[in-house]
Amino acid sequence: MTESTFPQYPRLVLSKGREKSLLRRHPWVFSGAVSRLEGKANLGETIDIVDHQGKWLARGAWSPASQIRARVWTFDKAESIDIAFFTRRLRQAQQWRDWLAKKDGLDSYRLIAGESDGLPGVTIDRFGHFLVLQLLSAGAEYQRAALISALQTCYPDCAIYDRSDVAVRKKEGMALTQGPVTGELPPALLPIEEHGMKLLVDIQGGHKTGYYLDQRDSRLATRRYVENQRVLNCFSYTGGFAVSALMGGCRQVVSVDTSQDALDIARQNVELNQLDLSKAEFVRDDVFKLLRAYREHGEKFDVIIMDPPKFVENKSQLMGACRGYKDINMLAIQLLNPGGILLTFSCSGLMTSDLFQKIIADAAIDAGRDVQFIEQFRQAADHPVIATYPEGLYLKGFACRVM
């Protein structure tokens, strides 16, 4: 496409000196960096981003209601945002997933991990021949038709299901959406395979897109710690860690969650893998409350898995989240036998690995126990983190030996 025929986009002009992050190819423009918008742009529409002197920097999506005023689609001035653009991005992402799927024997994985795959606000998980789509930004929603067309080109045999029913959309002025887009409706529970486990996924009603694919490697790593051990699996959801613990030869695993539906699926997952159901206990309760009750009754465990939901959504909540993480890890440490293992995680993007490690150290001091950090975890390799967007590393975890 020549310069004369290239689409003319509205221009977002940055204040003087506020272009540095874009020059380092960070994909966000915050409201404080914006001087003005030249031309009219609807919510999610494509805009050009320029410095205060008019020098072109990037092309992105406009979101006037968000603190993130623009999310960058491309740093290539010659690249138009159209079906061909999304097709290229999908095929680039698929190359890595193809290698992973073949290497690890996967039938389910994250196909698109937002900014780290060059598609800000777009999450796509593949479960067998179902593609589960989440559009989390105004730009992603604006380009919905182009993205779906590209998906149909790249994956003609796959059904597409929309799970854009997440509250973060409201921050950018968008309604929540859910339902089939193309192809058949997913079954109530779809079986997938992961590291030798068969697991049932609730695409339509489960958390996020139905299953936490990002913890795949952590679930596998659990097996090395659990042989002949008594395991407590907190915030168990549908039992991925529990099934992995049983496959690792644990003596007992107690799974705790507030959702009876999730616990019912966890039980089915144990049965589906033909594991000893008598070694699995399922408890519907609040984890904080139950841990305190266990402490009062002198219960002890050899391994505790702590995989809570996100405690922090924004910086104003960070201090409160730190207290929550410290309290719950302190309780877990108190329940472990000497030499026991704590596998603890945080999926809060604002919680850095260094801060999380400090919180665990503080929790150990409050519990009156010494702790050794023996292994570190992050999201699985189908959730890459592009170097210019460190915020993409949201999941972090540690294996800790409690003395």
Swiss-Prot record:
Record-linked InterPro entries: PUA, PUA-like_sf, PUA_sf, RLMI, RlmI-like_PUA, SAM-dep_methyl-trfase, SAM-dependent_MTases_sf
Keyword terms of this UniProt record: Cytoplasm, Methyltransferase, RNA-binding, rRNA processing, S-adenosyl-L-methionine, Transferase
Named from the GO MF annotations, one term is:
RNA binding
Which Pfam families does this chain map to? Methyltrans_SAM, PUA_3
Q: What is its EC number?
A: 2.1.1.191
Q: Any keyword Metal-binding?
A: no
Q: Does the keyword 4Fe-4S apply?
A: no
User: Which top EC class is named for this enzyme in its record?
Assistant: transferase
Tell me where in or outside the cell this protein is found.
Cytoplasm
Query: Record's Gene Ontology CC terms?
Result: cytoplasm
- Tell me which residues make up the PUA domain: 9-88
Quote the function comment for this protein.
Specifically methylates the cytosine at position 1962 (m5C1962) of 23S rRNA.
Q: Name the PANTHER family on file.
A: RIBOSOMAL RNA LARGE SUBUNIT METHYLTRANSFERASE (PTHR42873), S-ADENOSYLMETHIONINE-DEPENDENT METHYLTRANSFERASE DOMAIN-CONTAINING PROTEIN (PTHR42873:SF1)
Family under the similarity heading = Belongs to the methyltransferase superfamily. RlmI family.
What NCBIfam families has UniProt attached to this entry? PRK15128.1
HAMAP family per UniProt: 23SrRNA_methyltr_I
Its recorded name reads Ribosomal RNA large subunit methyltransferase I
Organism (species): Salmonella typhimurium (strain LT2 / SGSC1412 / ATCC 700720)
As recorded in Swiss-Prot or TrEMBL, the protein's gene is named rlmI
